[in-house]
């Protein structure tokens, strides 16, 4: 169901704009953050249905941000998808092994990206840590 709140944690404005344009036209509501620290605060305050997160962020990176989200009972069950330029197979495996709920390589292809977002949102809630 469209209308869900999605947090986008991405330091590149062009990438945020692309994701914003793709998701808002489908009816999703967005929060945006340029850093992992701000993303943690927004996730805790707003409890989005999904977090889309870059891996290479200023300050704490996406993997550390995910670790902190999972360690906090208030945000531990929020699904998090990595959206990253790290497209090599070993990078993908490392990212998924870190506990991300999905992986999207950049540049994004709109249809597969929207399918991934919908698929992750439709999954049963994850168990808390």
PLM regions and their residue ranges:
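Active-site beta3 strand of CheY-like receiver
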Residues: 46-52, 57
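Acidic catalytic/metal-coordinating carboxylates
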Residues: 14, 35-38, 61-67
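The feature encodes the CheY-like receiver
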Residues: 58, 76, 88, 106
């Amino acid at each position: 169901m469209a209308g869900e709140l999605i947090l986008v944690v991405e330091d590149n404005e062009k990438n945020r704009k692309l994701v914003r344009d793709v998701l808002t036209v489908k009816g999703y509501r967005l929060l945006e953050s340029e850093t992992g620290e701000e993303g943690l605060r927004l996730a805790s305050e707003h409890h989005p249905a999904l977090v889309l997160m870059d891996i290479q962020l200023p300050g704490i990176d996406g993997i550390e941000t995910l670790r902190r989200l999972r360690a906090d009972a208030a945000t531990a069950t929020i699904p998090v998808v990595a959206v990253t330029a790290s497209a090599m197979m070993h990078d993908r495996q490392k990212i998924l092994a870190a506990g991300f709920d999905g992986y999207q390589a950049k540049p994004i292809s709109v249809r597969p990206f929207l399918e991934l977002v919908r698929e992750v949102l439709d999954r049963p809630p994850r168990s808390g840590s």
